[in-house]
């Protein structure tokens, strides 16, 4: 009997453990069903960020594979629209070409203005040094009547020399004009237009909060999705195990009762020691 009780208890404990493990597994399955929505939202955010190229100022709808080829015109190009050094802004044709994005091949040309710089240098006139006299002692001051005439002639000679020096010094003034010309850069943009249908706006799926819906199982749909189904399955399993154990216990008690009972139809046997006992005669009276 003790062995049977131990077997029943061990079976009951094993069944309870199985029910608990089944309930935990069902709850984990219900949680994992909610995770893919968050992963889809994170992937969509990453794809949306990867379409933008930092620092490129490109429209997100365009492709990021842009080929840039640089070429330049010589400084003596026959382009009469821009005047070097005039500060004239670029023509409207070039600004309009920057905004063209519809064709598959767009060529953008930029013609910056040239900045002229002028530098002037001055060379001071070289003054002739007076030659020293051969002998200072031989210098004599002579006064003559023609000193005034000589002074006038000297003044005229000085003026002529000064004029000649000015004529020669004009050559010393020279103007250096440095013109810095920036070569225009031709940007060849090759892009393939993409249809709007291939890039649908990615939005996070809306979270359904209302429990009212159509269908045969509409009242229970939201509760089953949140793990309520796992609790129901675990409760049903525990109830079935309890019913089985109760039936086993009832059968065990019935069998135990059958072992201690006897059939009423069987005749009673006389005890072996009854012949040695005192028996009263049925026809005689007994007197003490």
UniProtKB/Swiss-Prot annotation:
Gene that specifies this protein: sdn-1
Record: glycosylation sites: 69, 71, 86, 214
Extracellular topological domain residue ranges: 27-231
Cytoplasmic side: 253-288
Protein name: Probable syndecan
Acidic residues compositional bias, start-end: 141-164
Phenotype on disruption: Disrupted mitotic spindle orientation of the ABar blastomere division axis, orientating parallel rather than orthogonally to the division axis of AB derived cells ABpr and ABal. Reduced mig-5 accumulation at the cell contact sites between the ABar and C blastomere cells. Irregular positioning of the AQR and PQR neurons in larva at the L4 stage.
Lineage: Eukaryota, Metazoa, Ecdysozoa, Nematoda, Chromadorea
Organism per entry: Caenorhabditis elegans
Function: Cell surface proteoglycan that bears heparan sulfate. Required for correct mitotic spindle orientation of the ABar blastomere division plane and this may be through modulation of astral microtubule array, and in association with the wnt-signaling proteins mig-5 and dsh-2. Involved in the migration of AQR and PQR neurons, which descend from the Q neuroblasts. Promotes the axon guidance of D-type motor neurons.
């Amino acid at each position: 009997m003790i062995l049977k009780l131990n077997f029943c208890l061990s079976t009951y404990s094993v069944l309870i453990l199985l029910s608990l493990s089944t309930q935990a597994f069902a709850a984990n399955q219900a949680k994992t069903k909610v995770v893919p929505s968050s992963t889809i939202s994170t992937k969509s955010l990453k794809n949306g960020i990867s379409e933008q190229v930092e620092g490129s100022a490109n429209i997100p709808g365009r492709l990021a594979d842009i080929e840039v080829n640089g070429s330049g015109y010589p400084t003596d190009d026959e382009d009469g629209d821009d005047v070097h050094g005039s500060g004239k802004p670029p023509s409207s044709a070039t600004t309009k070409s920057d905004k063209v994005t519809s064709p598959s091949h767009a060529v953008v040309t930029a013609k910056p203005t040239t900045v002229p710089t002028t530098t002037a240098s001055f060379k001071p006139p070289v003054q002739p040094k007076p030659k020293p006299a051969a002998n200072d002692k031989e210098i004599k001051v002579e006064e003559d009547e023609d000193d005034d005439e000589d002074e006038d002639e000297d003044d005229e000679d000085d003026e002529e020399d000064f004029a000649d020096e000015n004529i020669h010094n004009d050559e010393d003034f020279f103007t250096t004009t440095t013109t810095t010309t920036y070569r225009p850069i031709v940007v060849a943009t090759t892009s393939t237009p993409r249809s709007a249908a291939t890039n649908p706006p990615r939005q996070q799926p809306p979270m359904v909060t209302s429990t009212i819906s159509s269908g045969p199982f509409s009242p229970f749909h939201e509760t089953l999705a949140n793990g309520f189904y796992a609790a129901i399955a675990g409760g049903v399993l525990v109830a079935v195990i309890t019913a089985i154990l109760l039936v086993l216990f009832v059968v065990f008690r019935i069998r135990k009762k059958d072992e201690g009972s006897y059939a009423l139809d069987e005749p009673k046997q006389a005890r072996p020691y009854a012949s040695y006992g005192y028996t009263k005669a049925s026809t005689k009276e007994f007197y003490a």
